[in-house]
Amino acid sequence: MTSGAAGAIAHAVRCVTKPGDEVLTFAPYFPEYNPYINKSGAVLKVVPADTSSFQINFEKFEEMLNPNVHAVLINTPNNPSGIVYSTETIKKLASVLEKKQEEYGHEIFILSDEPYREIIFDGVDAPYVSKYYANTLSCYSYSKSLSIPGERLGYVAVNPAAKDADVIVAMCCQISRGTGHNCPASLPQLAVSRCMGKTSDLSVYETNMNIIYDELVKLGFEVVKPGGTFYIFPKALEEDSIAFCEKAKKYDLILVPSDSFGVKGYFRMAYCIDTEKVERSLVALRKFVKEEYNM
């Protein structure tokens, strides 16, 4: 057990890398990965995005793979794009890494960041990474599925088929003492143990997503439809997404520019709010687009 998915990643990276090793992740990515990885002594490097689908950009990924890469950090369903990596994508990732392990003569671990695992929309293919790749460490948080983000409760799950799985589990038990990511308090652990296999009502997220997606398309935004999470990641109406989001503030719209996610020219919208608030926000969005961009 760890203090959320952040603690899980902090543990996992220290188990499978040493200082100076490279960890690859894929844009768009959660910006806090930088301190999680770099503070461990490993070095985070970011593979450019495939903005047509926000699936993995395999051409750029294979260009960046080298013998110093010891881990690949993925996030599916993804923050900020809302995209879920397909079974085809995960199978291809596994195939590439299996070949590179053999070529380089060492293991390459997937660190699978999965806090949004239960927030999957109807009909979306959402594979478990560990089913397709033995050297997988799954990093999970209960904060999204049970709507308890402040409780900081998660875990690292080591695939039993992973190389030296028993050693990695033992390492996780010791790492807490050195990182400050101590085990969560016993009371929330006890509470969550009584909620296993359950979630809060997550259906509102898909309702909100469909409302926002349809409106964005109607207004002329370029956007890939999310398959999960409570985020959507449209292309901004000008190249400078920071300027775009600053203008939106005048209309009481809080949008997050994409620069910190490793992509230029996009922005993130979150819709983990009541549907009534989503509908009211669209009135402001229409006004913003009309007055600032004549659309």
Regions found by a protein language model. Name each.
Residues 2-295:
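PLP-dependent class I/II
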